Amino acid sequence: PMWPVHTWLPDAHVEAPTAGSVLLAAILLKMAGYGFIRFSLGLFPVASEVFTPLIYTLSVIAIIFTSLIALMQEDMKKLIAYSSVAHMGFVTLGIFTLQQQGIEGSIIQMISHGLVSAALFLTVGVVYDRMHSRLISTYGGLVSVIPKYSILFMLFALASLGLPGTSGFIGEFLILMGAFKDNFLVAVIASIGVILGAAYMLWLYKRVVFGKL
């Protein structure tokens, strides 16, 4: 789901049951990235190089723009959905750096995001089955009620924002290394997305887990 043809994704996640969101985030969203690596780079290397500036532009917009939209969301599933678009922006950016680090980082990022986003949708599904609401304002103070759940939620949120030591960090770090080698300006702009990613995930976690009960 690259920007600007990503608008179907948040609504699809909202309407889908938890299992559907898990499959969509963990498997289906990675098919385009696999196609780029398997077919575009392998069969059409010259065309891939020609279209690199366009993919860079779309990737950077996806990273920054959808991260800002995620910061404005009140629906937990929509927030995670927009974060998925931002993460896929990192994937396409890494692939089209045409650098070893960037491509390897994109592969790691796809695997990492598949696992972490699926886990985040499952954590949302756990509380949705009990409260029948996805709105962040509905929740608060969960740490005092279900502390073990809060710990798991924290681990998945930290992995999503790319904390050093998690799989999310490895993928994003390698992608940015490849980007810095190929285009310094694009890499600097994309780095802002790492900060925004931390902002919306910590904002989500704070309001759901440490807000007023």
Q: Which residues are covered by each model-predicted region?
A:
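A glycine-biased, small/acidic residue-tolerant capping/turn segment at secondary-structure junctions
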Residues: 211-213
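Hydrophobic transmembrane alpha-helices and their helix-loop junctions in integral membrane proteins
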Residues: 1-209
